[in-house]
Each structure stands twice: as C-alpha cells, then as structure tokens.
C-alpha cells in the first residue's frame, strides 16, 4: 500500500462519490424511467436489480445527467436542477477525462544528485535543475489549486446529488 496524503485522499474519495452517483444512481434512473430501456435488459439483469443488485453504466448515467441538464422552466430558463446537472457533468468530465491526462509536473525534471553542486563543472547543471524544479513547483501549485477549486465546486452542488 502506498502512502497518500489526506488532502489527496479527500479529493479522490469525494470524486469517487461523484463517479458512483453518475454511473450507478443516474444510470439507474435512466433505465427505470424509460420502459423501452428497462424492457431491453435481459430478464436475469432485471431480476438481479429487482432483488437489490446495483446497475452501473457510464453511458446511461451520462445520458441521464445530460437530460437533466437540458431541463427548462415554462419561461425557457434553465432550472436549478439543470444548472447543477451541468456542473455535475463538467466535474465528472474533468475527473474522468481531463485530470488523468494532465502533465506530471515532475516528469520534466531530471534526476539529480545534490552532491553534483559541489563539483565546479556541474554547477551549470545545478542551475538548470533549479530552473526545471521551479517550473515543476509552479505547475504543481497550479494543479493543486485547480483540484481545490473543483473540490469546492463539488461541495457547492452536493445537496443536488440525489435521485
């Protein structure tokens, strides 16, 4: 088991809950609210679900959240439910698609031996390493701030995550 800081665990656990919400609860709503989809499920799947099993489908979950995000009131204005669903969709996409493929800030920094700074001919390498490290720290700080902003955004819509 690898050690992970609490702040990282907090981020992962909360976005895991968002993922579960979309892929199970919203997917379930998409199936049970559509007679055609429900009927298209194999009988053994319907039986398992009727006995309390869990239904998971990313496609059905996203379809339901998109439908929810398109809801408007009688004046054609997006409802609060729709606005929250749009935020849910955006956060889900960020967590499952964008964030996993962002750059590793420390990949650009070469492994470096601190003892190299003692050798005169290695001082230039030391300066380059310090510059690379500074850029990595800045990128890591920006990514951490992005993570925090998204986590705060998730907390703002948490009361809307129900079906």
Residue positions per predicted region:
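Long C-terminal interaction/binding lobes of large macromolecular proteins
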Residues: 163
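Long, non-globular targeting/processing and low-complexity regions
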Residues: 1-157
């Amino acid at each position: 088991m690898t050690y992970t800081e609490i702040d990282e665990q907090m981020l992962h656990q909360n976005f895991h809950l968002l993922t579960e919400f979309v892929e199970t609860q919203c997917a379930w709503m998409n199936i049970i609210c559509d007679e055609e989809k429900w009927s298209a499920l194999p009988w053994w799947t319907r039986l398992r679900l009727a006995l309390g099993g869990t239904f998971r489908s990313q496609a059905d979950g996203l379809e339901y959240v998109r439908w929810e995000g398109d809801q408007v009131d009688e004046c054609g204005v997006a409802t609060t439910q729709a606005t929250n669903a749009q935020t849910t969709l955006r956060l889900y996409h960020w967590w499952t698609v964008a964030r996993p493929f962002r750059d590793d800030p420390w990949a650009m920094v070469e492994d470096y031996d601190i003892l190299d700074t003692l050798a005169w001919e290695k001082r230039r390498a030391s300066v380059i390493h310090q510059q690379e490290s500074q850029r990595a720290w800045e990128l890591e700080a920006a990514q951490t701030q992005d993570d925090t902003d998204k986590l705060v955004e998730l907390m703002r819509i948490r009361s809307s995550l129900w079906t």
